[in-house]
C-alpha cells in the first residue's frame, strides 16, 4: 500500500478562503472585521517565522492585525498590563502570545490572564476544561487542525484505535481529548511508556508530536493506518523532516501528512478560524 498525502496547504487555503468570505459578508452587512493581536517577546528566530506566517494569514483574510514586538527584557508586569489592555479593547477578538516566552516570564500566568473569550490559541484553563467536559469553546489550534485533516480523508474515526505520541499541553494532551470527542479509543504515550513499538503497530490512527527527527520507524506503521506527523525538525543539511520516517511510512499507511506542508498550515488556519468565531460570539 502506498499512502495518499494529506495536503495541509490545500485544506488550509480552503479554510482561509471560507473565513475571508465570512469577513466580506460582515463588511457588506456593516459589521466590524475581526481583530487579532500577536505578541512576540524576544527575538527567537523560529518564533519570528511563526509570528510572520500568522500575521500574513490575517492580512490575507482581511482581519485587523496588531503586532507587539517586545524586547526580551520585558517584565512580567509589563506583559500582563499589555494583555489587560487588549482584553478591554473591543476591536480585538483574539490575543496570541507566541510561545516559548523568555525564561524570566511565567507563561502559565500570562496565558491565564488572557480573557478566555479572546484566547484564540485555546490554551486558557477555561477552554481546555471545556474540551474535557465535551463542551468545546475555542479549541487548541494544532489539535483542531489535525481533526480537520483527519476528516478530509473521508474515514470515520469512530472506534479507531488512536495513538498520540507526546503528551505536551500544546498538542498531545488536547489531541487526546479531541480524538475522544471523535469517539476513538485513545492511548497517549510519554517517556515512561513501555513497548512503544507494539502500541504503534496496533494503531489505526497515529499522531506523533515529539520533536525528534525520524523518531518512529516507518516499518512500525500498521498497514492502512492514518499517520499525522506534527514534528518539524531541521537537519544539519537544512532539510525539514518530521518525527516519522516518511519514506518507509508512506509505503504502509493509507494516509499521511508530509513535512512540511501537512499540520503546520492547518495550525495557522485554525487560529484564523478561532479568531472569526471569537468575533462572531462577541457580536451576539
From Swiss-Prot:
Q: Where is NADP(+) annotated to bind? A: 166-168, 232
Catalytically driven reaction(s): (6R)-5,10-methylene-5,6,7,8-tetrahydrofolate + NADP(+) = (6R)-5,10-methenyltetrahydrofolate + NADPH; (6R)-5,10-methenyltetrahydrofolate + H2O = (6R)-10-formyltetrahydrofolate + H(+)
Q: Which EC number applies?
A: 1.5.1.5, 3.5.4.9
GO BP of this protein: L-histidine biosynthetic process; methionine biosynthetic process; purine nucleotide biosynthetic process; tetrahydrofolate interconversion
Summarizing the function annotation, the protein's role is:
Catalyzes the oxidation of 5,10-methylenetetrahydrofolate to 5,10-methenyltetrahydrofolate and then the hydrolysis of 5,10-methenyltetrahydrofolate to 10-formyltetrahydrofolate.
> In which family does this protein belong, per the annotation?
Belongs to the tetrahydrofolate dehydrogenase/cyclohydrolase family.
Record-given protein name: Bifunctional protein FolD 2
Q: Which organism is it from?
A: Colwellia psychrerythraea (strain 34H / ATCC BAA-681)
Amino acid at each position: 500500500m502506498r499512502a495518499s498525502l494529506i495536503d495541509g496547504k490545500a485544506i488550509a487555503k480552503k479554510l482561509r478562503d471560507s473565513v475571508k468570505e465570512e469577513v466580506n459578508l460582515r463588511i457588506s452587512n456593516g459589521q466590524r472585521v475581526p481583530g487579532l493581536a500577536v505578541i512576540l517577546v524576544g527575538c527567537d528566530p523560529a518564533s519570528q517565522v511563526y509570528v510572520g506566517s500568522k500575521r500574513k494569514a490575517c492580512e490575507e483574510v482581511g482581519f485587523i492585525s496588531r503586532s507587539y514586538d517586545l524586547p526580551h527584557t520585558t517584565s512580567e508586569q509589563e506583559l500582563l498590563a499589555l494583555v489587560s489592555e487588549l482584553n478591554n479593547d473591543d476591536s480585538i477578538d483574539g490575543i496570541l502570545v507566541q510561545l516559548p516566552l523568555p525564561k524570566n516570564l511565567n507563561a502559565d500566568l500570562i496565558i491565564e490572564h488572557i480573557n478566555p473569550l479572546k484566547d484564540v490559541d485555546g490554551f486558557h484553563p477555561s477552554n481546555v476544561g471545556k474540551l474535557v467536559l465535551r463542551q468545546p469553546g475555542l479549541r487548541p489550534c494544532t489539535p483542531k487542525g489535525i481533526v480537520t485533516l483527519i476528516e478530509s480523508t473521508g474515514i470515520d474515526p469512530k472506534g479507531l484505535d488512536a495513538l498520540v505520541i507526546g503528551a505536551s499541553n500544546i498538542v498531545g494532551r488536547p489531541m487526546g481529548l479531541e480524538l475522544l470527542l471523535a469517539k476513538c479509543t485513545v492511548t497517549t504515550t510519554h517517556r515512561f511508556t513501555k513497548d512503544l513499538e507494539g502500541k504503534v503497530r496496533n494503531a489505526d490512527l497515529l499522531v506523533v508530536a515529539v520533536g525528534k527527527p525520524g523518531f518512529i520507524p516507518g516499518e512500525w506503521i500498521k498497514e492502512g493506518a492514518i499517520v499525522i506527523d506534527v514534528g518539524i525538525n531541521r537537519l544539519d543539511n537544512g532539510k525539514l523532516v518530521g518525527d516519522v520516517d516518511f519514506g518507509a511510512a508512506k509505503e504502509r499507511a493509507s494516509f499521511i501528512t508530509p513535512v512540511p506542508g501537512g499540520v503546520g498550515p492547518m495550525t495557522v488556519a485554525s487560529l484564523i478560524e478561532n479568531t472569526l468565531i471569537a468575533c462572531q460570539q462577541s457580536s451576539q
